[in-house]
UniProtKB/Swiss-Prot annotation:
Biased composition (Basic and acidic residues): 23-63
Region (Disordered): 1-63, 208-248
PROSITE patterns according to UniProt: MARVEL
Main location: membrane
Residues annotated as domain MARVEL: 82-204
Tissue localization of expression: Highly expressed in testis.
Stated name of the protein: CKLF-like MARVEL transmembrane domain-containing protein 2
Membrane topology, as annotated: Multi-pass membrane protein
A Gene Ontology BP annotation from the UniProt entry: chemotaxis
Family under the similarity heading: Belongs to the chemokine-like factor family.
Molecular function via GO: cytokine activity
Keyword annotations from UniProtKB, A to Z: Chemotaxis, Cytokine, Membrane, Transmembrane, Transmembrane helix
Native species: Homo sapiens (Human)
Amino acid sequence: MAPKAAKGAKPEPAPAPPPPGAKPEEDKKDGKEPSDKPQKAVQDHKEPSDKPQKAVQPKHEVGTRRGCRRYRWELKDSNKEFWLLGHAEIKIRSLGCLIAAMILLSSLTVHPILRLIITMEISFFSFFILLYSFAIHRYIPFILWPISDLFNDLIACAFLVGAVVFAVRSRRSMNLHYLLAVILIGAAGVFAFIDVCLQRNHFRGKKAKKHMLVPPPGKEKGPQQGKGPEPAKPPEPGKPPGPAKGKK
């Protein structure tokens, strides 16, 4: 048993508590003394940056692109579709055949209807080539351009075949330039028919969108400017009951 403390002796002072920022002795490693500075709490989330982040745009859709960014995407997508599906090559070949036929017939005396048909078809083929090359049709959505192109090819094929038949029947003897011009007109008609077949393959497996030609609903008309809402009318006061009629 420990000896009892003598009477009148002062008790031993308790050890001083460690400072609040100091680490306990158990956490000391490699003889390093604990720092007096408290550690900062680790932030779980990063601070938001002041720079606005750009939204990721889809590759196969126009998304929210505007201005020049939208036109660049439309131009690239339109030319990709126009050249990969074979429409550009067919239309350019048809246009080349018609221009060559016009040059060959320029030095001969032919019926004016042949010149008219060739000039008309050159104009239509040039129009559609420029339309698809510069993506103009993407900004005119109220016209069904694939259907218009399909009808243009059908009409061009019919007109060019008719021009060949008319050119053969209108002359009994044909020189070399005239014969070459007739062959080129027929080749342009064949290319137009091939373009019709390509248009049909393009339409396969596609469904028309519902309500595509339905106009958007009109906006509800708000209150007229300068006129506030009409104040509510106060309720009419009740009429006092009439005097009771006495009996005679």
